[in-house]
A protein has these predicted regions:
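C-terminal accessory regions
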Residues: 128-139, 143-221
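Conserved helicase motor core of P-loop NTPases
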Residues: 1-122, 133
Length: 221
């Protein structure tokens, strides 16, 4: 039996690794510093604004592909994944005359968007992140070209667009198996039904260099 005792995602001495161990064992006396911060805000509207500000700051530092905003819920509040994605997309990939968009229908996508696959499709797996490189129109159909990296450029027609969603913010569940230089975590009492200790542990351990929690300290499990 091989036992792995060393944490490789975070550096030695990382508060992220330390606090993850504490949370796993039910100890909420966390250690804060430059690599692990908590920004107090019990108000959802204020929290959404704070997360947007932190996201922009972290993207400038690490790049949009190395930063994730994690939230327990996909919808229902101002700090849910769907609402945050729309706002973040407007901040980092605003519309312009040079960027084609999908027009009409329920799925609005834009050239330059960071997107996530939500279904397995050939060599593209559920949860894979890509970037929209081109949007073409073929009669009444629209073709969206997504670069998932490693030479995987895939085409999605109008009837396949539901297989894509914006990927600036994502649920903690969807983030499992991924890692980022910086993660911003939405932690609110309004989401308490979802805030289990394993979920908080999973969210924290997605970060390699920085973890920023925004929300209500009372929501910590």
């Amino acid at each position: 039996v091989i036992r792995l005792d060393k944490v490789y995602r975070q550096s030695s001495g990382s508060r992220i690794a330390l606090n993850a161990r504490l949370i796993r064992h039910g100890n909420l006396n966390l250690e804060y510093g430059t690599d692990f911060r908590f920004i107090d805000s019990a108000d959802l509207t204020e929290s959404a604004k704070l997360m947007e500000e932190q996201y922009l700051r972290e993207v400038k530092k690490y790049g949009v592909d190395r930063v994730a905003l994690l939230s327990p819920f996909r919808q229902k509040t101002e700090t849910c994944v769907n609402a945050l994605n729309e706002t973040l997309r407007g901040l980092v990939n605003p519309p312009s005359a040079s960027k084609n968009e999908t027009i009409g229908g329920k799925k609005n996508l834009r050239v330059g968007d960071k997107v996530m696959a939500n279904k397995n499709n050939g060599d593209v797996s559920n949860g894979d992140i890509g970037y929209i490189k081109e949007i073409d129109y073929d009669g009444e159909d629209v073709i969206v070209y997504v670069d998932f990296g490693d030479g995987r450029i895939r085409e999605f027609g109008k009837e396949e667009l539901d297989m894509l969603e914006l990927g600036y913010a994502t649920t903690v569940h969807k983030s499992q198996g991924s890692e980022y230089d910086s993660v911003i975590i939405n932690l609110q009492k309004a989401h308490s039904i979802m805030l289990t200790r394993p979920l908080v542990y999973t969210a924290i351990t997605r970060g390699k260099k920085e973890v920023i929690i925004v929300g209500d300290r009372r929501a910590l499990c």
